[in-house]
Amino acid sequence: MVFKKTQPSPSLKNPERIQSFKKLSKKIGIKFSKIEYYNTAFIHSSYKNENPEILEDNERLEFLGDSVLGLVAARSLFQKYPKASEGELSRIKSKIVSTPILNSIAEKLNLGEYLLLGKGEKNSQGKGRRKIAANLFESLVGAIYLDRGFEVAEKFIVQHLLEFAENPDMEESVRDYKTQLQEYSQKHFKTLPVYRMKGESGPDHSKMFQVSVRIRDQWEASGYGASKKIAEQNAAKELYIRIRRGF
């Protein structure tokens, strides 16, 4: 994520700062009632530490946003995948609220443009920068929740998080558990895993596939995904982890 180098004053009396939030409001399609929430959402703790006049940073909003994200993700997945087990739902949830996903959405929305960041943090790279961006998305969710309520926050999350996470283009980022399972099965069981399509559900534009994988009659697991490929990967992951753990 690219963070703005020349940053305006955090004061809401500053025309440039106010204009930036009008731009953000239009971009995400949400009318801001209390801009002060969003102002705080985009003040990093490092900026507050370097500017004693700043009374609050975005960490509390980040905490709140993380909780709202978790609830929305859990409820949405519970409703969308009625046949998925608790373990499967937990794995899907952990993926879609992970730092890489939140960072990708923050970059897509260019949230770094609005962030007030300390001089030291501006030079952060790699995981540190991705974590800042992911936390920024959470603090924005917290601000939306306080300002507009749960329903508006939920709509924003579903639009920018859950749909993004189910994008088939993300298949390339899925760890190749099929290959790992195949290699392990050949080495220890002298046979190949067998995949079987178990079913599909949902409308045409948002299909959910279920695939099972079996090694002989000894090991079997199922996986779900927005495509057959992802479902196979998730099934392979489930079985591979079970085998390695011995159950």
Curated annotation (Swiss-Prot):
Its EC number is 3.1.26.3. It comes from the Bacteria. HAMAP family: RNase_III. It comes from Leptospira borgpetersenii serovar Hardjo-bovis (strain L550). Mg(2+) binds at residues 62, 135, 138. The active site is at 66, 138. It catalyses: Endonucleolytic cleavage to 5'-phosphomonoester. This is Ribonuclease 3. One of its GO terms (molecular function) is double-stranded RNA binding. PANTHER family: RIBONUCLEASE 3, RIBONUCLEASE III. PROSITE patterns: DS_RBD, RNASE_3_1, RNASE_3_2. Keywords: Cytoplasm, Endonuclease, Hydrolase, Magnesium, Metal-binding, mRNA processing, Nuclease, RNA-binding, rRNA processing, rRNA-binding, tRNA processing. The gene is rnc. Digests double-stranded RNA. Involved in the processing of primary rRNA transcript to yield the immediate precursors to the large and small rRNAs (23S and 16S). Processes some mRNAs, and tRNAs when they are encoded in the rRNA operon. Processes pre-crRNA and tracrRNA of type II CRISPR loci if present in the organism. Residues 21-149 form the RNase III domain. Residues 176-245 form the DRBM domain. InterPro entries: dsRBD_dom (IPR014720), RNase_III (IPR011907), RNase_III_dom (IPR000999), RNase_III_sf (IPR036389). Signal peptide: none annotated. Belongs to the ribonuclease III family. One of its GO terms (cellular component) is cytoplasm. GO terms for biological process: mRNA processing; regulation of gene expression; rRNA processing; tRNA processing. Homodimer. Gene3D superfamilies: 3.30.160.20, Ribonuclease III domain (1.10.1520.10). Its cofactor is Mg(2+). The keyword Cytoplasm applies. It is found in: Cytoplasm. The keyword RNA-binding applies.
